[in-house]
């Protein structure tokens, strides 16, 4: 049973998946930082210094806080600013992954096209083809 598990774990697809998950987790942290530290501050500056992560709509009159963390402690809120930031994260990740997969598919198609084209016949093969064609035609060459 241990041998079977080792064979399964060492298959290319499982190892590739593990590497992809690890790289994806690291990439997610980069995208989160890019959105939170670079993109949202620029959007905030353009919109007059707004911090979208703290934007919320209280669902009860008991919520009087000015920050999202405090408002969540006081009652139910719609944290639409946080949702906007997370949605932007998702769109960036999806766009980058789409680009990577598209590039990989293009490379794969190119590799398949190169592999599918037959190799040029060697000089020996060309001579054998000529001899075959002469024999098929029934004409005897003059020697």
Curated annotation (Swiss-Prot):
Q: Which UniProt keywords apply?
A: Cell inner membrane, Cell membrane, Ion channel, Ion transport, Membrane, Transmembrane, Transmembrane helix, Transport
List all membrane-crossing ranges: 19-39, 81-101
Main localization (coarse) = membrane
Topological type in the membrane? Multi-pass membrane protein
Top-rank taxon, per record: Bacteria
What family is reported?
Belongs to the MscL family.
Q: Which HAMAP family match?
A: MscL (MF_00115)
Q: Its function?
A: Channel that opens in response to stretch forces in the membrane lipid bilayer. May participate in the regulation of osmotic pressure changes within the cell.
Provide the assembly information.
Homopentamer.
Full protein name:
Large-conductance mechanosensitive channel
Protein's organism: Rhodopseudomonas palustris (strain BisB5)
Its gene is: mscL
């Amino acid at each position: 049973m241990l041998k079977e598990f080792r064979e399964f774990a060492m298959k290319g697809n499982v190892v590739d998946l593990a590497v992809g998950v690890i790289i994806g987790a690291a990439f997610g942290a980069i995208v989160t930082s890019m959105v939170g530290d670079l993109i949202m501050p620029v959007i905030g500056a353009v919109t007059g210094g707004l911090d979208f992560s703290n934007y919320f709509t209280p669902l009860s009159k008991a919520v009087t806080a000015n920050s999202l963390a405090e408002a969540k402690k006081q009652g139910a809120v719609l944290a639409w600013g946080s949702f906007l930031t997370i949605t932007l994260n998702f769109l960036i990740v999806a766009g980058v992954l789409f680009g990577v997969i598209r590039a990989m598919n293009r490379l794969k198609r190119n590799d398949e096209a190169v592999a599918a084209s037959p190799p040029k016949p060697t000089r020996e093969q060309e001579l054998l083809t000529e001899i075959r064609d002469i024999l098929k035609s029934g004409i005897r060459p003059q020697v």
